[in-house]
Amino acid sequence: MGLELPLILGTSSVFRREQMERLGIAFQAASPDFDETPMLGESAPQTALRLAEGKARSLAGRFPEALIVGADQVAWCDGRQWGKPMNLANAQKMLMHLSGREIEFYSAVVLLNTVTGRMQRHIDKTVVVMRKLDELHILRYLEREPDAVYCSCALKSEALGALLIERIESTDPNALIGLPVFRLVDFLKNEGVDVL
C-alpha cells in the first residue's frame, strides 16, 4: 500500500474501543457529532446503517485523510426499537419486558475512506433468545454488571449478560457487542490494510 491513512473509530462507546484494541490495530477514537434520533417509519436495520454512516461522515471534516469506522446497533423486539436504558430503573423494566423473548440486534459497520469518498457498508443480524428472568435475577445482574445500563437492551453479552441468554444465532459473535469485526477486517483489507 502506498499512502497509509490513519484509522479513526467514530465512537464514544468504551465497548467498541475495547473491541478495536483487542484487534491490535493502531487507531484513534473520536466522538462523532451526530444526531442519533430514530426517524419515524425507519426499520431497525435502516436506523443502524443510517447512524453508522452519519457517525463516519460527521468526522470527515476533522479527518480529511483517514479511514473512518462508523458503527451502530439497534435492537428490535415486539414491533419496536430498543436502545440503551441509561439508568438502573429503565434497565430493570427493560429486562423484565424482554424476559423469555426473542430480540433481533442489527449491528451496522461502515468504513469511509475520506480521500476517495468510498464507503463500505454492512449490517449484521444477531438473534438472541432471552432466558425467563425474575426480578431478583435482574437485580443481581445489574448490581454485578453496572455498565450494562450503557448496552443495548441492558445486555452486556461479553460478560455476565451471557447468563441471561438462552441462545444466540449469529454469523459474527463480535457484532452483538457492537462492532461486526469479521466484516470490518474485510473492509480494511479492501483498503490495503493488513490487519495481521
UniProtKB/Swiss-Prot annotation:
InterPro entries: ITPase-like_fam, Maf-like. The keyword Hydrolase applies. The record marks 15, 73, 158 as: Important for substrate specificity. One of its GO terms (biological process) is nucleotide metabolic process. The keyword Cytoplasm applies. Its cofactor is a divalent metal cation. It catalyses: N(7)-methyl-GTP + H2O = N(7)-methyl-GMP + diphosphate + H(+). Its main location: cytoplasm. The active site is at residue 72. Its EC number is 3.6.1.-. One of its GO terms (molecular function) is nucleoside triphosphate diphosphatase activity. Keywords: Cytoplasm, Hydrolase, Nucleotide metabolism. It is found in: Cytoplasm. One of its GO terms (cellular component) is cytoplasm. It is an enzyme of class 3 (hydrolase). Belongs to the Maf family. YceF subfamily. HAMAP family: Maf. Nucleoside triphosphate pyrophosphatase that hydrolyzes 7-methyl-GTP (m(7)GTP). May have a dual role in cell division arrest and in preventing the incorporation of modified nucleotides into cellular nucleic acids. This is 7-methyl-GTP pyrophosphatase. It comes from Neisseria meningitidis serogroup A / serotype 4A (strain DSM 15465 / Z2491).
